[in-house]
Structures are given as structure tokens and as C-alpha cells.
């Protein structure tokens, strides 16, 4: 799992600080993709033998992604906003050739997406909201993806073309949702954002459309949900799994969502 898991309450502070380190000691020995899908019971038993992952995972989703949380916990979200603004106002013009006069529109675009994610893309609507041409909106989305502020998903990466609109958009990590969204946070969005964020390292992630939420490496289907999530949406689909929050152990093809954070 990227960055540092860290709790919001004093009693969890030490445990959360060593959350990732404990897991890595275990997973360096036993974890690879084939173990995750074929022997998840053994991995979960080892992890749960060291700590209770669920409360730590809940903290991680809100606060644990960036290590500067350790430096200033009270102003963590404010710092995240400042970093995002720096990337848009300074780095995008310098590194991507974005016109500095248009950074206000890019920030507006990010703000719209933060309120709407996961966003099934209507480029014409987005373009109208920020007052730019369709192709300019696509360029801005690509820039925000390269800047690790967004994750852009396509239904078919093999045939994707230049300037093709993404099929679904997520903020880059779940902490950004809590920091930037103006509406109440939907936990299902947080779960999906976490899954995309973690699975994209070392794997291709495609939007599943009618076959689950995500297709991984062109073959494995993941549907994301809570502990009571059923297989209705992925019934009879080969190599399909549910990634469920609020469970410590796997049940058949229903796997703990938190375990995805250690696949790379």
C-alpha cells in the first residue's frame, strides 16, 4: 500500500505508523499475484495474526496516502489542496506546456470531477462547464492524469486512440476525495478509487462496463463493494471476484478489499 497508513486517534497512532511495515514483513515472503488469488486465506491469516486490518484500513482511506500527514495532521487536507494547486499552477505550465492563463480552468475541472467521481465522461458537458473546446478538455484530463491527480480508465486499452475520451474518471487516491469534494463522500466511490489506485501498479486496469467494475490485465474481473455485495453483476463470468470492504478473510471469490494494497 502506498504512502503511510496513519490513524486519527491517539490510541491508534503507533499501530498505524507501523501498519505498512508489519504487512511488508509478511508479504515480502508470501505475496505475489498468484497467491493473492489462489491462497488468500493464508495471507489473511498471517496479517490478522499481527493486527486488525479493518480499522487501520478505514484510517488509511481518509488520511494515510501522503507521508506529510505525519508532519502536520491537523492541516493535512489543506496541504493536499496546496500541493494540487502547485502542480496545476506551476508544474503543468513548466512540464506540460499548459498556458499559465488557463490553470484556473484546470482547477475548475478538477473541482467538478472531485464532486462527481466516479465520473462516466460527458466531454461536451465538461467543456461547457469550464468554457473550453472539447479537445482542450481532453488535453487537460490527460495532463491531470500525467500529474497523478486523476486516473483515467478506458474500456479497451488495445484500441484506444489519441484524443479519445476516457470512459470513467477517478481522483488519483481516496484521500483526495475527502480533501476536495464539496458534497458528502460516498463510500462506494472511495472503495473504487482505492482499488484503481492500487491495481494500476504493475497491471493494466480497464473499465468493465457491463462486466464488473474493472478488468485487470485483460482477463480478471473485479466488482467492488461492501461485505454484503452479491455476485449478481458478475454471475457466470470466468475469473471474476468481488473486492469487499469490512471483511477480514476471503469467502470463495469474495476477497478483502484492503489486501489489494499489497499486490505490488
How would you label these PLM feature ranges?
Residues 2-15, 19-27, 142, 147-264:
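A cross-kingdom feature that marks ATP-driven nucleic-acid transaction machinery
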Residues 18-178:
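Interdomain hinge/linker elements that couple catalytic modules in large macromolecular machines
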Amino acid at each position: 500500500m502506498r504512502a503511510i497508513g496513519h490513524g486519527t486517534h491517539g490510541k491508534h497512532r503507533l499501530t498505524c505508523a507501523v501498519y505498512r511495515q508489519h504487512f511488508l514483513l509478511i508479504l515480502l515472503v508470501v505475496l505475489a499475484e498468484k497467491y493473492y488469488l489462489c491462497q488468500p486465506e493464508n495471507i489473511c491469516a498471517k496479517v490478522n495474526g499481527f493486527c486488525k486490518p479493518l480499522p487501520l484500513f478505514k484510517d488509511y482511506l481518509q488520511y494515510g496516502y501522503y507521508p506529510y500527514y505525519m508532519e502536520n495532521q491537523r492541516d493535512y487536507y489543506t496541504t493536499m489542496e496546496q500541493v494540487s494547486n502547485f502542480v496545476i499552477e506551476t508544474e503543468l505550465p513548466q512540464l506540460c506546456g499548459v498556458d499559465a492563463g488557463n490553470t484556473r480552468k484546470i482547477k475548475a475541472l478538477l473541482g467538478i470531477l472531485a464532486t462527481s467521481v466516479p465520473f462516466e465522461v460527458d466531454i461536451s458537458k465538461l467543456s461547457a462547464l469550464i468554457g473550453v473546446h472539447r479537445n482542450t478538455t481532453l488535453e487537460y484530463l490527460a495532463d491531470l492524469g500525467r500529474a497523478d491527480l486523476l486516473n483515467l480508465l478506458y474500456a479497451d486499452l488495445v484500441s484506444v486512440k489519441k484524443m479519445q475520451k476516457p470512459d470513467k474518471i477517478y481522483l488519483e487516491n481516496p484521500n483526495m476525495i475527502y480533501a476536495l469534494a464539496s458534497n458528502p463522500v460516498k463510500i462506494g466511490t472511495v472503495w473504487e478509487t482505492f482499488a484503481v489506485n492500487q491495481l494500476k501498479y504493475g497491471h493494466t486496469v480497464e473499465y468493465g462496463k457491463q462486466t464488473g467494475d474493472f478488468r485487470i490485465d485483460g482477463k480478471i474481473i473485479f466488482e467492488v463493494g461492501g461485505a454484503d455485495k452479491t455476485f449478481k453483476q458478475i454471475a457466470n463470468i470466468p475469473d471474476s471476484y468481488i473486492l469487499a470492504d469490512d471483511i477480514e478473510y476471503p469467502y470463495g471469490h469474495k476477497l478483502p478489499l484492503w489486501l489489494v494494497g499489497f499486490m505490488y
